[in-house]
Amino acid sequence: FAVHVDAVAIHCRLALGWPLDTNEGTLELAKDMWEPDEPALWHKNFSDEIMHWVEVGQPDDKRVMKASGRARRVTVWAFQNSTPIWWDNLTNKVSRANNLTVWQIPTEQSQALGALAQRSMQLQVSVQDGTVWINDGQTTVEITPVKLKG
């Protein structure tokens, strides 16, 4: 059950990326948990070209640069406590990736979002001025991501 809750919590964090990153509503879950060549989310056009590659967590520089080469746009959503250390180590290595945007979800907000994870859930999402409110019918979590690059 703990692994299931972790997976659901990660997908809750993906729920944050969906409303902030799409203007066409065509992002789809990929197979990143079991397919190393795929992101967490992506948007492909009808020619199967990757328009937008979305990573969640702290990918290494090789993965970020690979994504940058394959997609028109790459977004990383980092949510761990160690994000500042990870980003300090990664900044210079990915500086030439001009199509890369990196966001940090503050730790407290990420934990509150993860706490919404249930086996079965419905979430309502509102976005205004870069702030996201996610509600599960009982609890509302406010997320204000911090842009690290892009």
Question: For each predicted feature, which ranges?
Answer:
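Short amphipathic beta-strand/extended segments with alternating polar/hydrophobic composition
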Residues: 51-57, 140-148
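An exposed acidic His-Trp-rich patch
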Residues: 60-85, 89
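Acidic-basic catalytic patches of nuclease active cores, encompassing PD-(D/E)XK
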Residues: 1-33
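Domain-level recognition of nuclease-like catalytic cores that cleave nucleotide substrates
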Residues: 86-140, 145-146
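Short hydrophobic alpha-helical runs that function as membrane-insertion/retention elements
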Residues: 55, 73-78, 101-103
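Short connector loops at helix/strand junctions that flank enzyme active sites
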Residues: 24, 36-38, 49, 69-71
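Conserved catalytic cores of phosphodiester-cleaving nucleases, focusing on short active-site segments
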Residues: 41-43, 50-67
